[in-house]
Amino acid sequence: MAAAVLRDSTSVPVTAEAKLMGFTQGCVTFEDVAIYFSQEEWGLLDEAQRLLYRDVMLENFALITALVCWHGMEDEETPEQSVSVEGVPQVRTPEASPSTQKIQSCDMCVPFLTDILHLTDLPGQELYLTGACAVFHQDQKHHSAEKPLESDMDKASFVQCCLFHESGMPFTSSEVGKDFLAPLGILQPQAIANYEKPNKISKCEEAFHVGISHYKWSQCRRESSHKHTFFHPRVCTGKRLYESSKCGKACCCECSLVQLQRVHPGERPYECSECGKSFSQTSHLNDHRRIHTGERPYVCGQCGKSFSQRATLIKHHRVHTGERPYECGECGKSFSQSSNLIEHCRIHTGERPYECDECGKAFGSKSTLVRHQRTHTGEKPYECGECGKLFRQSFSLVVHQRIHTTARPYECGQCGKSFSLKCGLIQHQLIHSGARPFECDECGKSFSQRTTLNKHHKVHTAERPYVCGECGKAFMFKSKLVRHQRTHTGERPFECSECGKFFRQSYTLVEHQKIHTGLRPYDCGQCGKSFIQKSSLIQHQVVHTGERPYECGKCGKSFTQHSGLILHRKSHTVERPRDSSKCGKPYSPRSNIV
């Protein structure tokens, strides 16, 4: 976009130039609150983020316009001179009723605002300005360069400057100040009180803030790092009466100081009356209020789904279009949102900017950090509507709900086995392929799953970080500690729906339920005998092989089952038989137990 070029159509009298210096000294500049992007950074922003950028820039511009335009102006007529802007049509002022302020076009504000709108790459939008800035419309029937207009204007009209509306949504009187003008409300009473005599203007482009301050701004324009150019009012000399204690900047009046302090970084002056949450921008507060009201004004034309924010609707549209405009330069993977691409790129760079204050663990995305922090706080915000069970993650709730529906949408194409999770199917398919891609660096043993490898690593380190608070017993895995703690509490959370029997572990319940179904899925390849449990099949197969893998360390006797070895070991530890005082026959303590 070419920058707007200023052309001085008449000379400015010396008195006006001197008056300008008195007017502009100490004012806040648009550059102080502007936000810039490089070409590369701008390319990473999606449409929703560009809309947010537009909103922020327009609100900041409305603030600066109020600070610069009318403060310090003299109560006298403006000298006749004009400033025009190339490419910006002259605008005829709509007729206004006597009870309302008359409207006049603003050749100072229009170039700024059209530049900001062009940045968002949203063609076909029309710009509406109220108050001193009047109406800027693309319709040529409103333009009349041959008939210069005459109108009265007072300083208070600058309070109503720079209200933006999208095409097809013209403003109403009730909307003035609703969005971008809210931060300017403090100026209106002072402006009205300090001024009675209106300024007389004879031409559309001769409003006092157009004829003087715009002419001065053209002398200090500055190109930003972005491809577009903005004009920045800047004054480096002059007396400054009010100084900000936060940033040290000075203003020519107290009202300007109040406005300057509102745009300091980190400040959130706009508070929600419902919950007390505060925001830095009024537009953010308006979006937040819809949480309380339940308003969802943005509706998807494809599926009818509604949203509280326009940016969310824009992102949702990509679900239907399948658009993925953001591509990773490293691996070529594409994403529908730029934020997802930024998080993905951290996989390649190894960057982990989000750190947990509790344990110091770092993460690549803020959402992952939030989920992790719930392990410290114990928060479980997701509740099952069927059984009331709580979960830390929404994904865990979705998986859990399949227990109630018995849904297993992921089916193996080779054996027909189905799974409730896609990852479960992927892991199962490795059984058919025989792939074991995860290998232990210590012993060379390989595994089909990374989680199994991680568990195996603890065998080499002998690390047992999970200690029972009741008995002090340590475990390698947290899941085993949880199961162990049920022996102390007596908790049996898994209930059989057939007979009502309870179990401490879920897999024990699964094995038990096979009794009711009669299912014996584990068949012996030698004799065809079937078993309910896989462990029972393994024990049975020893009968055919003759293997006795369990050997006593004291006497060398071997056994086919581990339980047989345990029973045998007790024969080495029990006391020698003693004679009965009644019958004289020897007995052992174990034989005395009924």
Curated annotation (Swiss-Prot):
What main location does UniProt list? nucleus
Keywords attached to this entry? DNA-binding, Metal-binding, Nucleus, Repeat, Transcription, Transcription regulation, Zinc, Zinc-finger
What Gene3D superfamilies does its record include? 6.10.140.140, Classic Zinc Finger (3.30.160.60)
Q: Annotated Gene Ontology MF terms?
A: DNA-binding transcription factor activity, RNA polymerase II-specific; RNA polymerase II cis-regulatory region sequence-specific DNA binding; zinc ion binding
Give the start-end ranges of region Disordered.
Answer: 569-594
What InterPro entries does its record include? Answer: KRAB (IPR001909), KRAB_dom_sf (IPR036051), Zinc_finger (IPR050331), Znf_C2H2_sf (IPR036236), Znf_C2H2_type (IPR013087)
Keyword Repeat listed = yes
Annotated Basic and acidic residues bias? 572-582
Subcellular localization(s) per the UniProt record? Nucleus
Is Acyltransferase one of the keywords UniProt gives this record?
no
Q: Where do the zinc-finger regions (C2H2-type) map?
A: 242-264, 270-292, 298-320, 326-348, 354-376, 382-404, 410-432, 438-460, 466-488, 494-516, 522-544, 550-572
Biological processes, Gene Ontology terms: regulation of transcription by RNA polymerase II
**Which sequence ranges form a coiled-coil region, renumbered to this chain?**
none
Please give the PANTHER family that the UniProt record associates with this protein. PR DOMAIN ZINC FINGER PROTEIN (PTHR16515), ZINC FINGER PROTEIN 22 (PTHR16515:SF58)
Described function: May be involved in transcriptional regulation.
What's the protein name?
Zinc finger protein 416
Q: Which organism is it from?
A: Homo sapiens
What's the name of its gene?
ZNF416
